[in-house]
């Protein structure tokens, strides 16, 4: 069973990043212009996938899906190489894809390492290139399943804390965690009002979170980033929620610029703020995180 069930358009696997074996390309939904336009960035090489990740064609959990699908594409690219050259080619692909975004590079390395390990096992056992390509594509889908199941469960945990008839303020686009709590709200028949802070400069809140919430049937209002404290003072917001790019082992939360001021305002007005995510053992403290 796929874990993107009952989620909106933007979170369906094929609409995040998808490797087409017949065409030999990875399609990535261009979130920079969605929902005004539904266009896909077509990548014919793993280098183009890495560039798309670096250029913010996709974000949040999107780069993880793109990296895994990019490894399948790399296997397609190098299918006519000698065994030794094929392995080196895949190692280069794993490095390029995992280091496309500095802030999440350590987490991305786990994605490409899994793909590379599978590749090494298959090639060692004498698998044909078409079998390798298919296996890496399926592995990318399975990695999606694992990530979606974990993150939507975290989102569901937040949803269970929110009473019926509440209003929430979101920031940026927490992707699968957002999908998780929205889906859980629907499953438990809760009537929730969603305020989406626009989140400059890419407007992920206005374009992505708001589109997903509306797509899934919620009463959704986009607000400018400088309206947040006013709405809090007018008691129009009951809960604040965002994702977290990195949570270090000392409890520090690193996220989109602007998160701190929302958290401070929420604290001032006595509004619960939930940053959804998981501690990253690669970072002991916030000082070790490279900020883009």
Question: What do the predicted segments below correspond to?
Answer:
Residues 6-127:
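Long amphipathic alpha-helical segments
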Residues 32-35, 40, 44-54, 135-141, ...:
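Glycine/charged-rich beta-loop-alpha catalytic/anionic-binding loops adjacent to active sites
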Residues 40-46, 78, 167-175, 249-254:
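Short, glycine-rich nucleotide/cofactor-binding loops
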Residues 61-63, 168, 172-178, 201-202:
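Gly/Ser/Thr-rich loops at beta-strand to alpha-helix junctions
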Residues 109-164, 190-192, 196-240:
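Ligand-binding beta-strand-loop-alpha-helix segment within the catalytic cores
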Residues 178-187, 263:
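Histidine-anchored nucleotide/phosphate-binding helix
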Residues 199-292:
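Conserved phosphate- and dinucleotide-binding cores of soluble alpha/beta proteins
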């Amino acid at each position: 069973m796929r874990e993107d069930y009952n989620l909106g358009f933007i979170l369906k696997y094929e609409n995040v990043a998808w490797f087409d074996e017949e065409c030999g390309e990875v399609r990535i939904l261009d979130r920079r212009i969605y929902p005004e336009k539904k266009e896909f960035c077509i990548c014919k090489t793993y280098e183009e996938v890495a560039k798309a990740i670096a250029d913010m064609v996709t974000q949040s959990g999107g780069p993880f899906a793109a990296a895994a699908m990019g490894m399948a594409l790399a296997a397609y690219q190098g299918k006519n190489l000698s065994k030794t050259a094929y392995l080196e080619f895949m190692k280069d692909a794993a490095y390029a894809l995992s280091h496309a975004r500095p802030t999440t590079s350590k987490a991305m390395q786990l994605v490409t390492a899994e793909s590379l390990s599978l590749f090494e096992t298959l090639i060692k056992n004498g698998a044909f290139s078409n079998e390798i390509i298919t296996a890496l594509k399926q592995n990318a889908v399975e990695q999606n399943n694992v990530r979606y199941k974990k993150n939507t469960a975290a989102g569901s945990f937040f949803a269970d804390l929110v009473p019926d008839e509440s209003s929430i303020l979101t920031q940026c686009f927490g992707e699968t965690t957002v999908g998780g709590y929205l889906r859980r709200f629907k499953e438990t028949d809760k009537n929730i009002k969603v305020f989406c802070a626009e989140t400059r400069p890419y407007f992920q809140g206005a374009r992505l979170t708001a589109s997903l919430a509306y797509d899934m049937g919620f009463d959704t209002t986009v607000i400018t980033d400088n309206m947040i404290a006013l709405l809090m003072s007018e008691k129009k917001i009951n809960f604040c929620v965002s994702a977290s790019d990195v949570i270090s082992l000392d409890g520090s939360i690193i996220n989109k610029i602007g998160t701190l001021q929302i958290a401070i305002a929420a604290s001032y007005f006595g509004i619960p703020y939930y940053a959804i995510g998981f501690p990253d053992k690669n970072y002991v403290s916030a000082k070790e995180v490279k900020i883009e």
